[in-house]
Amino acid sequence: MRLCDRDIEAWLDEGRLSINPRPPVERINGATVDVRLGNKFRTFRGHTAAFIDLSGPKDEVSAALDRVMSDEIVLDEGDAFYLHPGELALAVTFESVTLPPDLVGWLDGRSSLARLGLMVHVTAHRIDPGWSGCIVLEFYNSGKLPLALRPGMLIGALSFEPLSGPAARPYNRRQDAKYRDQQGAVASRIDKD
């Protein structure tokens, strides 16, 4: 059962759930908290690679990712990031979120943005118990026009679901946590699997 607005506020007040900066009451809805777009992005470079062999040797996968992923792009206040039709880009939320070991989070896009062709997550919308950091956004423009995305705009909504008990292996305590304390648009670390 997902937390309702009253419970989200109570968990924030008690410090069991942390969203920094804390959202104003107007952004805490019936069962979600609106989140904003941060200013860090990452894209695919122009490249000539025919494919990336995701099951290949780790050093080859790592080298291929280095060739195709851009450095992190940091926008200044007022600047826009243009996502063209058919393009994938990574970004992060403005807010940093910390979940306790007995709570899982879910990221959903906004219907108003989806109606323009913007997907805010390709498949990974679960936020593991014990997570701490900004939430990665996997943007895809399935529309017909470029979309101007500006830091600070409302970009998605988080909901939270209590677990039957605390996780034995919360994300922040796992030795193999590839994205622990992520603050920027971190590229895929599939080579660390």
Curated annotation (Swiss-Prot):
DCTP binds at R110, S111, S112, L113, A114, R115, D128, V136, L137, E138, Y171, K178, Q182. Residues 169-193 are annotated as: Disordered. Transmembrane segments: none annotated. Keywords: Hydrolase, Nucleotide metabolism, Nucleotide-binding. Pathway: Pyrimidine metabolism; dUMP biosynthesis; dUMP from dCTP (dUTP route): step 1/2. Its EC number is 3.5.4.13. Disulfide bonds: none annotated. It comes from the Bacteria. The active site is at E138. It catalyses: dCTP + H2O + H(+) = dUTP + NH4(+). GO terms for molecular function: dCTP deaminase activity; nucleotide binding. The keyword Hydrolase applies. It holds the Pfam family DCD. Homotrimer. Catalyzes the deamination of dCTP to dUTP. Belongs to the dCTP deaminase family. This is dCTP deaminase. It comes from Citrobacter koseri (strain ATCC BAA-895 / CDC 4225-83 / SGSC4696). The gene is dcd.
